[in-house]
């Protein structure tokens, strides 16, 4: 792992692998770089110099006292600048929101990929009443499993059967380590407002990725986001949901890799 310092001095770690055009990967909630991208990095590194970062508070990265979206943007910007040239930037889940906003702050993003970031252009994000507060109570009680489980069922709308499978996998323990970061991200996500006017002249070529089996709200958000970003298109991943990096790595790499290499 390598590391750069963010603007507030926090070390942000990233795995660098492969050779070719630079590709920065930003993971979503409950994950770190390895949990999110372990199955696709070995394929992507054949074509790109991959920098897969651990967002603050996870993995080998540090954390800070004052969490905010701005801090997240500073972190991603630091990794982008470490490449020394324009990069391809990809974000998944909450990482897609971070990647999109970071792209407004630099001229060093060549292309952008966004996979189900929950970025809605017409309304604020609404979670089931009391969900975030219940997760905070779990966290205060030391019940990390309750935090992550509630996130999966109430926010991601994962079925109880799928959650049971996820809990049986070794990477569930890694997700539990990151449980403390989930409520704070949900507060940021809930307060975020997408202003279409800020993106009216946004010309970075953008791929908006959505799984065919993902909820209709994700498809609606993708359509609205594509309408708001002038140089964008939608890629629907057949038979997939929110985590094609795990469920169909080859399909994911083919779709994303072709876009960034074109």
Predicted regions and their residues:
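Hydrophobic, aromatic-rich cap/lid helix
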Residues: 170-195
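Short beta-to-alpha linker loops that shape the active-site pocket of alpha/beta-hydrolase fold enzymes
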Residues: 54-58, 118, 240
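Conserved HGGG/HGGXW glycine-rich cap/lid loop of the alpha/beta-hydrolase fold
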Residues: 5-62, 85
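Short beta-strand/loop motif that positions the catalytic acidic residue
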Residues: 202, 208-210
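Catalytic active-site module of serine/aspartate enzymes centered on a nucleophile-bearing elbow/loop
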Residues: 231-262
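Flexible "cap/lid" loop of the alpha/beta hydrolase fold
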Residues: 97-140
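Active-site loop/oxyanion-hole signature of alpha/beta-hydrolase fold enzymes
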Residues: 51-90, 254
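Conserved alpha/beta-hydrolase "acid-adjacent" motif
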Residues: 215-221
């Amino acid at each position: 792992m390598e590391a750069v310092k963010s603007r507030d001095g926090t070390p942000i770690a990233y795995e660098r692998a492969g050779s070719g055009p630079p590709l920065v990967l930003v993971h979503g909630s409950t994950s770190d770089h390895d949990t999110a991208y372990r199955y696709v990095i070995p394929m992507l590194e054949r074509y790109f110099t991959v920098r897969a970062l651990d967002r603050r508070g996870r993995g080998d990265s540090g954390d800070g006292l004052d969490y905010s979206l701005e801090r997240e943007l500073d972190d991603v910007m630091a990794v982008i600048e470490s490449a020394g040239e324009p990069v391809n930037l990809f974000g998944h889940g909450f990482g897609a929101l971070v990647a999109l906003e970071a792209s407004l702050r630099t001229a060093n993003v060549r292309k952008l990929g966004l996979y189900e970031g929950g970025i809605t252009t017409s309304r604020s994000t609404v979670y089931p009443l009391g969900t975030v507060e219940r997760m905070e109570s779990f966290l205060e009680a030391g019940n990390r499993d309750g935090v992550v489980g509630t996130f999966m069922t109430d926010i991601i709308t994962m079925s109880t059967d799928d959650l049971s499978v996820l809990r049986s996998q070794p990477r569930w323990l890694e997700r539990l380590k990151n449980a403390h970061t989930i409520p704070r991200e949900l507060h940021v996500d809930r307060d975020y407002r997408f202003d279409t006017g800020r993106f009216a002249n946004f010309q970075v070529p953008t791929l908006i990725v959505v799984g065919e089996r993902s909820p209709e709200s994700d498809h609606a958000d993708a359509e609205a986001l594509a309408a708001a970003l002038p140089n964008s298109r939608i890629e629907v991943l057949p038979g997939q949901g929110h985590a094609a990096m795990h469920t169909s790595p080859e399909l994911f790499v083919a779709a994303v890799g072709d876009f960034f290499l074109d």
